[in-house]
C-alpha cells in the first residue's frame, strides 16, 4: 500500500510543476525593474502585453530577450528553461537604418 501512496504523490508533484508559478524580473533599458509572477505554462505574450500596457507603449515597439534570445509570443517559461528570479531584458525595437557599404 505504501507504494501506491507514494506513486500518486509523485504524480501530484509532476502536476504541481506544470502549474507552478515563478517570479520573473523584467528590466528596461533605463534599468527599471518590474516583477511578474507567471505560470510555467503561460505564453509569455501575456507578460509582454502587461509590461507594455504599464509602460504605455505599443508591444511592437519593444523586444524582449532572455539569455540573449528573442522571446516569441508563444514561448512559455518552461520551454525556455526559466527559473525563479530570472531576468528578461527589454530593448527599444530598432527599425529602419541603412547599409554603410
From Swiss-Prot:
Transmembrane segments: none annotated. There is a cross-link at residues 7, 16-17, 23, 37, 39, 45-46 (Glycyl lysine isopeptide (Lys-Gly) (interchain with G-Cter in SUMO2)). The modification N-acetylserine is found at residue 2. Its main location: nucleus. The modification Phosphoserine is found at residues 2, 9, 32. GO terms for molecular function: enzyme binding; potassium channel regulator activity; protein tag activity; RNA binding; small protein activating enzyme binding; transcription factor binding; transporter activator activity; ubiquitin protein ligase binding. The record marks 36 as: Interaction with PIAS2. There is a cross-link at residues 7, 25 (Glycyl lysine isopeptide (Lys-Gly) (interchain with G-Cter in SUMO1)). This is Small ubiquitin-related modifier 1.
Amino acid at each position: 500500500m505504501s507504494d501506491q501512496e507514494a506513486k500518486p504523490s509523485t504524480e501530484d508533484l509532476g502536476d504541481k510543476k506544470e502549474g507552478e508559478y515563478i517570479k520573473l524580473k523584467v528590466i528596461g533599458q533605463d534599468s527599471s525593474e518590474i516583477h511578474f509572477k507567471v505560470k510555467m505554462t503561460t505564453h509569455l505574450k501575456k507578460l509582454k502585453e502587461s509590461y507594455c500596457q504599464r509602460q504605455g507603449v505599443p508591444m511592437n515597439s519593444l523586444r524582449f530577450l532572455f539569455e540573449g534570445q528573442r522571446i516569441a509570443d508563444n514561448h512559455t517559461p518552461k520551454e525556455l528553461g526559466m527559473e525563479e528570479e530570472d531576468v528578461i531584458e527589454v530593448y527599444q525595437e530598432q527599425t529602419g537604418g541603412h547599409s554603410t557599404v
